[in-house]
């Protein structure tokens, strides 16, 4: 699912803003995930999943930093996230649908934070970008 030049520009422009708030947006995205889809908490039995917890903050930062790697390597997302793909498929065994759920929560968090910048075109570009990441993270399942 190749991104056009315009879509890449839309992703990187918003990412420049998101990158300054990785911890808070990552935390908010995970909190949205757990509030909207409580079944996803089963993958984090060792975490304190209460609102604002240090563990959620840390994992949210990891998730957004991985997205940052994908942005930096937007023409080779597969290569940038190869190790994460193996980790989630072979060790963590995360149900692939959860990547789509988290992507939706990230979209909501970013849109809520930057409403004037999150135009329909930007939304579509980010949706396609996050779908590409989800595809990479689930390709080892096959």
Curated annotation (Swiss-Prot):
Coiled-coil region(s): none
Gene3D superfamilies: Globins (1.10.490.10)
GO cellular component, one term: haptoglobin-hemoglobin complex
Highest taxon above the source species: Eukaryota
InterPro entries found in the cross-reference section: Globin, Globin-like_sf, Globin/Proto, Hemoglobin_a-typ, Hemoglobin_oxygen_transport, Hemoglobin_pi
Gene Ontology MF: a single term: heme binding
Name of this protein: Hemoglobin subunit pi
């Amino acid at each position: 699912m190749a991104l056009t030049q315009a879509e890449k520009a839309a992703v990187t422009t918003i990412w420049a803003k998101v990158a300054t708030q990785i911890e808070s947006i990552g935390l908010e995205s995970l909190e949205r995930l757990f509030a909207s889809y409580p079944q996803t908490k089963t993958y984090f039995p060792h975490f304190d999943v209460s609102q604002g917890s240090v563990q959620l903050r840390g994992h949210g930062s990891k998730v957004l930093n991985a997205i940052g790697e994908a942005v930096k390597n937007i023409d080779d997302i597969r290569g940038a996230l190869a190790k994460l793909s193996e980790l989630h498929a072979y060790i963590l065994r995360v149900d692939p649908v959860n990547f789509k759920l988290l992507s939706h929560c990230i979209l909501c968090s970013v849109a809520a934070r930057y409403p004037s910048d999150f135009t329909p075109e930007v939304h579509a570009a980010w949706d396609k970008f996050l779908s590409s990441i989800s595809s990479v993270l689930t390709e080892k399942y096959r």
